[in-house]
């Protein structure tokens, strides 16, 4: 018979429960995550850079479009202006064909016709000027192949060689472009103008 007051069996504790619990130390990662504030600042800087580039591209596009529209407005009449110049040239040739004496002694009917042709020629030139076409006369200037076309040479020792001494046909500009070069006669035989660099060198030597 078992004694109820006797010693009771105590269950054995497991080996795992008997081991002490030791917390592992926290190890920092080699490449920590960037700070949230720094990340937002970087994204904001990138967005601002993209915005500035977009604004710059839009401004360049606006300027280019404005320039192209202006060029189209100015130079879009090039072909028409050349045709009108041809008409004005023919009117001028008709006037030049009338001798000065015949003009002075012209009957009223012929004089009225001459005056009408002159008025028409001037009206055409004025209409061209209103549309950006300007007449230029290079008489006395140094020959420039960008604006003039030499037709012949004229012996003239009184002016430097390469000077425009005669203008056969006036030139015309459309905006900043040559619509038609002037047809000119250029002097030859005179002293050539010294280059600026050479002239400066001689002056310094004399000093």
Swiss-Prot record:
SUPFAM superfamilies in the cross-refs: Coiled-coil domain of nucleotide exchange factor GrpE (SSF58014), Head domain of nucleotide exchange factor GrpE (SSF51064)
Keyword annotations: Chaperone, Cytoplasm, Stress response
Region named Disordered: 1-33
Entry keyword annotation includes Cytoplasm: yes
Subcellular location: Cytoplasm
Single GO MF descriptor: protein homodimerization activity
Main localization, broad class: cytoplasm
GO cellular component, one term: cytoplasm
Domain of life where this protein originates: Bacteria
Gene Ontology biological process terms in this record: protein folding
Role summary: Participates actively in the response to hyperosmotic and heat shock by preventing the aggregation of stress-denatured proteins, in association with DnaK and GrpE. It is the nucleotide exchange factor for DnaK and may function as a thermosensor. Unfolded proteins bind initially to DnaJ; upon interaction with the DnaJ-bound protein, DnaK hydrolyzes its bound ATP, resulting in the formation of a stable complex. GrpE releases ADP from DnaK; ATP binding to DnaK triggers the release of the substrate protein, thus completing the reaction cycle.
Family stated for the protein in its record: Belongs to the GrpE family.
Subunit structure of this chain's protein: Homodimer.
Protein name, per record: Protein GrpE
Natural source organism: Rhodopseudomonas palustris (strain BisA53)
């Amino acid at each position: 018979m078992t004694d109820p007051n006797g010693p009771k069996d105590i269950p054995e504790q497991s080996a795992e429960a008997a081991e002490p619990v030791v917390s592992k130390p926290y190890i920092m990662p080699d490449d920590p995550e960037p700070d949230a504030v720094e990340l937002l600042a970087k994204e904001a800087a990138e967005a601002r850079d993209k915005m500035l580039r977009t604004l710059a591209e839009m401004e360049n596009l606006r300027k280019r479009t404005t320039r192209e529209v202006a060029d189209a407005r100015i130079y879009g009449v090039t072909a028409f202006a050349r045709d009108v110049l041809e008409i004005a040239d023919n009117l001028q040739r008709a006037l030049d064909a009338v001798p000065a004496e015949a003009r002075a002694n012209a009957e009223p009917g012929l004089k009225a016709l001459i005056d009408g042709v002159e008025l028409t020629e001037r009206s055409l030139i004025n209409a061209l000027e209103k549309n950006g076409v300007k007449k230029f006369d290079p008489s006395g200037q140094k020959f420039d192949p960008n604006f003039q076309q030499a037709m012949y040479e004229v012996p003239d020792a009184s002016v430097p060689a390469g000077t425009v001494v005669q203008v056969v046909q006036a030139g015309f500009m459309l905006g900043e472009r040559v619509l038609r070069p002037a047809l000119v006669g250029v002097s030859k035989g005179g002293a050539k103008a010294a280059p600026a660099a050479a002239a400066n060198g001689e002056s310094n030597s004399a000093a």
